A protein has these predicted regions:
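Acidic/histidine-rich, surface-exposed loop or edge segments in extracytoplasmic proteins
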Residues: 4-22, 95-101
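Extracytoplasmic
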Residues: 8, 45-47, 87
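Soluble non-cytosolic domains of exported or imported proteins
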Residues: 17-31, 106-116, 145, 149, ...
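Zn2+-dependent metallopeptidase catalytic core
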Residues: 18-72, 106, 113, 120, ...
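Sec/Tat-exported extracytoplasmic proteins
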Residues: 34-41, 119-120, 124-132, 158-163, ...
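Surface-exposed patches in mature extracellular/periplasmic domains of secreted proteins
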Residues: 38-53, 126, 131-137, 168-170, ...
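Zinc-dependent metallopeptidase catalytic helix centered on the HExxH motif
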Residues: 73-167
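Pan-zinc metallopeptidase signature
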Residues: 178-250
């Protein structure tokens, strides 16, 4: 297998030689995301490396947390685990692999192809929020697992994946049990963005971004309660379940 490198102004990508065109498209998408996210979150001070893998096995070898996250995720959301962010690099599956992973439901392919941006958002939030990875710091992985809905959710929401997740959310609600609030780690990939979407619709985009940039509270429910000041947790949960039902029914 021959590897090649493609560069843009702020990113570099290592990929199989045959993926050069797709790699250039990924970097173009990331450059646009960098510009759009510079105001609300900021930008890395250094170039971000992107490693594009042609198979999940290669990604798992490079990022051992990837297969663990896959095993934890609910079946409806596993196909959308498309990569893993580091402090200054993003590992992701190639666009061709992501296209093959897409299901037949509307929005599945679109959600998968936005995965590079979602991972970049997670990288940015880890840069700004020392309590969460990336990079992995003492205690941060434990906090991230407990708050996986927030880590995955901010990436899903800011990348634009949430609007495309609606059919997958509907499947999750049909086939799985009643989801926890906030979503459990198994549901983070699919349902995490819905919490941020609700918060933005009620308190504005700035409130949703701020939630991801502040150290989480001791428990996930306390973190959510802090984002909706003055409202009982049961009321916020009810609003979220109604919002989730609307997303699933759209």
């Amino acid at each position: 297998m021959a590897w090649a490198e493609t560069r843009s102004e702020h990113f570099s990508a290592r990929h199989e030689e045959r993926e050069s065109r797709q790699a250039a498209e990924v970097l173009e998408m990331l450059e646009q995301a960098r510009e759009e996210l510079s105001a609300p979150i900021g930008t890395p001070g250094e170039e971000v490396a992107v490693v594009i893998h042609g198979a999940a096995a290669g990604l798992a070898l490079a990022q051992p947390a990837f297969p663990v996250a896959y095993a934890v995720s609910a079946p409806a959301g596993r196909r959308y685990l498309a990569g893993w962010p580091g402090a200054r690099e993003i590992h992701l599956l190639s666009p061709a692999v992501l296209a093959r992973r897409a299901s037949g439901v509307p929005g599945s392919l679109e959600m998968l192809l936005l995965a590079p941006v979602a991972l970049y958002v997670q990288l940015l939030c880890g840069m700004r929020n020392p309590a969460l990875p990336p990079p992995a710091r003492p205690g941060s992985l434990r906090v991230a697992f407990r708050n996986a809905w927030l880590v995955a959710g901010i990436g899903q929401w800011l990348s634009g994946q949430t609007v495309h997740a609606r059919p997958a959310i509907a499947r999750r609600l049909r086939e799985g049990g009643r989801p926890a609030f906030p979503p459990a780690p198994s549901d983070a990939l699919l349902l995490g963005g819905s919490v941020l979407d609700l918060l933005a619709s009620e308190n504005g985009r700035e409130a949703a971004v701020a939630l991801a940039l502040e150290p989480p509270a001791p428990t996930p429910r306390e973190t959510v309660a802090r984002a909706f000041p003055g409202r009982p947790a049961t009321e916020v949960e009810g609003a979220w379940r109604s919002h989730l039902a609307r997303l699933a029914g759209s």
